[in-house]
């Protein structure tokens, strides 16, 4: 197999996890990292074990050894960087959101199709083996027809008024904060696991902390601490949301997202209730799958390759009792993306494990629709 060269644009919180995941594949070279200056690019390249460091993404795109561009920049740069990479004929792995707006995301869908390259979005919770087990169980009909889905995605890293991130700045993060950042994950997970599509939403959003102390220095997401030098800024985006949803089979659903919920570090939960049984997966207990019954004892299926169905077994790499985690799921997604790249042109379609640009566009559209609904006083809004 020919070696594939990877280049990373954006080395903040999630960027190093991209590098770690593709390095584990064994057939990918970490060629380059782009920073905002030559000095920062070189420093980040050395820290991540890349061969080259560049002071701009444009310089990285000019490197013929870079075949795949990983876009882990702040949201406002997603469209610009991805569009430029596609124009150079590079494969692209983009963090979500695909773009700041659904209109931009749709343009990227079209640009990727014209480029004829592999283009994926990192909805990484698809990569968990128990998520794939849930998808298999539901597709087999073990739950019966789903009629209700509910859940949440709760965090507490923005609970204090001294907590700040670029995600709270609409010019960098976009028109949504909590919904775009984590609510999009819940929606993708619900649709991926069930095969259903969200068709209508009704949103109620709130900004709990309306003024925050913005450090004059930079700070990554989830980074604690305060700064003596701050600027008090008005917050215009939501940090809490409650959403009702309807699916294309007539099922109903509801979910809540919030980043001001004390004690919830990364609490993503989805439950699917069907005509025969129910099923629940929770990210903070991600090696288990709860299955609920009416006429017999409920079950908790622990992650064990010998107990999983074929559709999930290949994504569990350790024996039962050996826990797998967030980074392992991320690597599973990257493995499927790079298998398609390694296959060569004409490149095969991405498998369900890996989210497409079309999936990314749909995620943008759902978030936009929830914001539209909330602005309209909580009216049902079609996707």
Across the structure, where does each feature detected by a protein language model lie?
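Predominantly a Rossmann-like dinucleotide-binding segment in NAD(P)-dependent oxidoreductases
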Residues: 125-235, 289, 377
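Glycine-centered short loops/turns at secondary-structure junctions
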Residues: 89, 116, 141, 250, ...
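Beta-loop-alpha module in the N-terminal Rossmann-like domain of NAD(P)-dependent dehydrogenases
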Residues: 39, 48-111
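N-terminal Rossmann-like dinucleotide-binding module
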Residues: 1-48
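Rossmann-fold dehydrogenase core element
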Residues: 107-124, 144-148
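C-terminal helix-rich "cap/oligomerization" subdomain common to oxidoreductases
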Residues: 1, 8, 68-70, 106, ...
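Hydrophobic residues in well-ordered beta-strands that form the structural core
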Residues: 15, 54, 71, 94, ...
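C-terminal glycine/acidic-rich active-site capping loop/insertion
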Residues: 206, 210-249, 270, 276-354
């Amino acid at each position: 197999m020919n070696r594939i060269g990877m280049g990373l644009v954006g080395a903040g919180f999630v960027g190093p996890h991209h590098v770690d995941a593709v390095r584990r594949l064994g057939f990918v070279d970490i060629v380059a990292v782009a920073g905002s200056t030559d000095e920062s690019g070189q420093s980040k390249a050395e820290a991540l074990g890349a061969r080259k460091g560049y002071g701009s993404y444009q310089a990285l795109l000019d490197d013929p050894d870079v075949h795949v561009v990983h876009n882990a920049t702040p949201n406002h740069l997603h469209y610009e960087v991805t569009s430029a990479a596609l124009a150079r004929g590079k494969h692209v792995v983009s963090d979500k959101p695909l773009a700041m707006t659904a209109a931009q995301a749709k343009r990227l869908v079209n640009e990727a199709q014209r480029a004829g390259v592999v283009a994926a979005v990192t909805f990484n919770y698809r990569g968990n083996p128990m998520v794939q087990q849930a998808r298999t169980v539901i597709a087999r009909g073990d739950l019966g027809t789903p009629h209700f889905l509910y859940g949440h995605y709760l965090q507490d890293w923005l609970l204090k008024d001294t907590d700040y991130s670029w995600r709270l700045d609409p010019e960098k993060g976009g028109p949504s904060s909590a919904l775009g950042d984590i609510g999009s994950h819940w929606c993708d997970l619900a649709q991926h696991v069930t095969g259903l599509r969200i068709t209508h939403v009704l949103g109620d959003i709130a900004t709990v902390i309306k003024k925050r102390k913005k450090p004059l220095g930079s700070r990554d997401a989830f980074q604690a601490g305060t700064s003596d030098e701050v600027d008090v800024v008005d917050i215009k985006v939501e940090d809490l949301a409650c959403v009702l949803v309807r699916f294309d089979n007539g099922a109903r659903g509801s979910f809540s997202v919030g980043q001001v919920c004390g004690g919830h570090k990364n609490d993503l939960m989805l439950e699917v209730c069907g005509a025969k049984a129910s099923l629940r997966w929770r990210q903070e207990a991600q090696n288990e799958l709860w299955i609920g019954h009416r006429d017999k004892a409920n079950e908790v299926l622990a992650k064990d390759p010998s107990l999983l169905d074929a559709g999930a077994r290949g994504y569990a790499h350790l024996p039962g009792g050996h826990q797998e985690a967030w980074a392992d799921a991320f690597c599973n997604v990257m493995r499927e993306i790079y298998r398609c790249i390694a296959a060569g042109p004409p490149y095969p379609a991405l498998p369900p494990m890996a989210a497409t640009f079309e999936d990314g566009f749909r995620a943008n559209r759902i978030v936009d629709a929830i914001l539209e609904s909330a602005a309209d006083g909580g009216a049902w809004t079609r996707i």
